[in-house]
Amino acid sequence: MSIIGRFKDIMSANINALLDKAENPEKMVDQYLRNMNSDLAKVKAETAAVMAEEQRAKREYHECQADMEKMESYAMKALQAGNESDARKFLERKTSLESKLSELQAANQIAATNAAQMRKMHDKLVSDIGELEARKNMIKAKWAVAKTQERMNKLGASVSSTSQSMSAFGRMEDKVNKALDQANAMAELNSAPQDDMADLSAKYDTGGSSQVDDELAALKAKMMLDK
């Protein structure tokens, strides 16, 4: 497809809308610039040929008009000279030029339309390229900030997840400690009760040696004698 065949696409292109839809505006802004500069080069190359065609069509159209006027003028002179036969020939020639003039007029209109479209495409591309060049650094800077923020958000989410895990671990530890305390209490309740009387009897149990008993009896006897 020739560049002029892309007139509607180029003229309807909306740079802002294209960038808004792009997943990575930083990369796409460079791609769009390359594409538009390529289109601009094609427009410039083809514009010269289209404008030359416009000038040629316009020149041929005016030349045909001039020839028709000339044939009519010759016919009038022939009639004035009393030569109707020559006048008829000049008028026949004028009639044939009329059909040619219609064709040249149509070709001239097409060439003029093509030239106008090429100029519009040229101006649109120059304008879009200028706008994109002016916004390129800002777009890249904003994209870098957005990606940095995205990484920070992911890091924050990871830290939050870790905190939640630690909190869950703490709750688990409390649950284990509670279960252990309950088990210890139950074990204490299930242990055999202490026999208080047995302990008291053991306190006064004469489990000492017979020598001690003999010495105690001798001491008592001595105390009786001293009285």
Curated annotation (Swiss-Prot):
Keyword Coiled coil in the entry? The reply is yes
Q: Which residues form a coiled coil?
A: 33-125
| Keyword terms | Coiled coil, Stress response
Q: Does the keyword NADP apply?
A: no
Please indicate which superkingdom the organism of origin belongs to: Bacteria
Region of interest: Disordered: 191-211
- A Pfam family cross-referenced in the UniProt record is PspA_IM30
Q: Summarize the record's induction comment.
A: By cold shock (at protein level). Expression is sigma W-dependent; induced by alkali stress and by infection with phage SPP1.
Question: What family is this?
Answer: Belongs to the PspA/Vipp/IM30 family.
Specify the protein name. Phage shock protein A homolog
